Amino acid sequence: MENHKTDDRMEDLMQKVRESRGSDAASMLDYCTQIEEYADRVGDARLLGFAHYYKGRTYYLSNETGKVFEEIGEALGYLEQSGQWELVAASYNLMAIVSVGKGNLSFAIEYYLAGLKYCKKYELIEVESRIESNLGS
């Protein structure tokens, strides 16, 4: 699996995902599915990680927590393979938030710490601040 030069249609879909996240779950999932199908065809880890991460995030905002772990779990390998460290750290933060909501505090701490490890290693100050804020609440 590789990172490929992304065609304009995929770049447009990715931009739509970034711009409309949190506003229209059905459209977000459709955009992500289109990206995922294309990425599967061409073997693009970067796009697969992106699509699964944003699907997971959309499911979180829709309160479908079981699907969050399914999508984020799928995303993590692709995100790491393609070096999308900010999304890796954000994935761990999201899994921690869901774990807190389910009362699994020990898992939440592990996820927060994993996210912080990536933040420190790759100097991801914004994500690090979000994780630290979540840890403090």
Can you name each region flagged by the protein language model?
Residues M1-S23, G43:
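N-terminal alpha-helical interaction modules that lie
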Residues D7-D8, V42, R46, E86, ...:
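Residue signature of alpha-solenoid helical repeat architecture, marking inter-repeat boundaries
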Residues M14-R21, F50-L61, E86-G101, Y112, ...:
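Conserved alpha-helical positions within TPR/SEL1-like repeat arrays
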Residues A26-L29, G66, E86, S106:
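Residue register within tetratricopeptide repeats
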Residues M28, Q34-I35, V68, E74-A75, ...:
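Tetratricopeptide repeat
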Residues E37-A51:
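Short, charge-rich amphipathic alpha-helical segments embedded
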Residues A39, Y59, L79-E80, S99, ...:
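Eukaryotic all-alpha helical interaction scaffolds
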Residues E64, G73-G83, N104, L113-E123:
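Tandem repeat domain/solenoid detector
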